């Protein structure tokens, strides 16, 4: 019984990824172009999310700076979720919904990209960060579940929404990980050329 339950997780995850491949390839390609335009113009990616999505933000920043699967020059990226002192100071002395927005206002510049990761798209601190990014003329890339919540409604025509067609948080996060891999690989392919990665 337990093994069947475990196997079902694998099946459900694989099914969702297969079904989402065609739907998500276009917005992922648009996100690759947004990140590429940013970093090749001297800009940076600011990534944020809450809970497990915070870890995903840190993972993407690490891929940019330390590399993904191939050697390449470092790309400027920062996870806004990494500085515990700053985050707890903001939570203790200010409106906690502004914890990422303050960093966007301090660090963001026109041409930069804000990468916001969320399951439901209604996180008040991500909404505030998106508003701050728009004030700075930054492009916003959102990874969300279905249908993207309030965050999706805030996006401009130049922003990118990658909305995983599922409601279950675990499935959405599994696809987010794959999307971040596709995004990192796409940037590398555009910078370094197409190349098969050896096993």
Sequence positions of predicted segments:
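Short, glycine/polar-rich helix-capping loops at beta-to-alpha or helix-loop-helix junctions
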Residues: 143-158
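Glycine-rich, small/polar surface segments that engage phosphate groups of diverse ligands
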Residues: 34-108
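Surface-exposed amphipathic alpha-helices with a cationic face
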Residues: 130-137
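Short glycine/serine/threonine-rich phosphate/pyrophosphate-binding segments
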Residues: 53-58, 122-129, 151
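Short beta->alpha connector loops at strand-helix junctions that form conserved
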Residues: 81, 118, 144, 161-168
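A charged, well-structured terminal subsegment
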Residues: 106, 169-199
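Generic N-terminal amphipathic, Lys/Arg-enriched alpha-helix
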Residues: 1-23
């Amino acid at each position: 019984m337990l093994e069947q339950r475990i196997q079902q997780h694998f099946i459900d995850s694989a099914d969702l990824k297969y079904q989402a491949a065609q739907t998500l390839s276009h917005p992922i390609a648009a996100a690759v172009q947004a990140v590429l335009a940013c970093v090749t113009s001297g800009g940076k990616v600011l990534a944020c999310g809450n809970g497990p999505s915070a870890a995903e933000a840190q993972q993407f920043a690490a891929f940019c700076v330390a590399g993904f699967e191939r050697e390449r020059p470092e790309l400027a990226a920062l996870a806004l979720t990494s500085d515990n002192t700053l985050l707890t100071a903001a939570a203790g002395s200010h409106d906690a919904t502004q914890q990422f927005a303050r960093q966007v206002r301090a660090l963001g510049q026109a041409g930069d990209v804000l990468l916001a990761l969320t399951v439901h798209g209604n996180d008040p601190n991500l909404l505030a960060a998106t508003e701050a990014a728009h004030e700075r003329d930054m492009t916003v890339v959102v990874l969300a579940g279905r249908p993207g919540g309030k965050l999706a409604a805030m996006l401009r025509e130049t922003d990118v929404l990658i909305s995983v067609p599922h409601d279950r948080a675990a499935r959405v996060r599994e696809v987010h990980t794959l999307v971040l891999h596709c995004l990192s690989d796409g940037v590398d392919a555009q910078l370094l050329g197409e190349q098969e990665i050896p096993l």
